[in-house]
């Protein structure tokens, strides 16, 4: 378990967002990949996500809950790596309750009982460990982010907390992947629709992601989920 040796961020540090503009030395290459990603999004992902948002609320809720629950074991791993013991206990409790009583996570029983979910990933963990952001990397299909987060994504793909593969696990994993892509894209539609109105969509999206990830790392360092809009008087929240 990693024990943090850095002080918690002050309120001023928390609300000021990233300390510097994202470092994007390969911007021209990144913009080329971004153009490919945008075409894929414009003609496939975004239309599917918009259609998904017209499904009944209970269907969308079930998909969202299933995807969130399937990811809880990786959240637990990162809670431990970040030294967030209380959060790890909460994650285990949520996963056990929702997987059983909540029918493999389709119903967020824990949330109804006041046991709120939080997110954690390897990119956040690296940030909690004070590993630097690194340059911006636009990845095909995966989008924009810094090198630290890109490495975290690669590690997440490689880690399988469910152990040996089986037909059941493979099926659930496939459903989780497809559901996660569609549900996640639908969740981001309001943000991306707003950013598309900016003169430079690439830069606007890159900077918005950088700010949100900086706040996400702060959550990991503090060991709690933050309402940044309320805490900072209008700043973006994750």
Language model features with spans:
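N-terminal targeting leaders of membrane proteins
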Residues: 2-85, 175-238
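Surface-exposed interaction patches
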Residues: 109-112, 125, 130-220
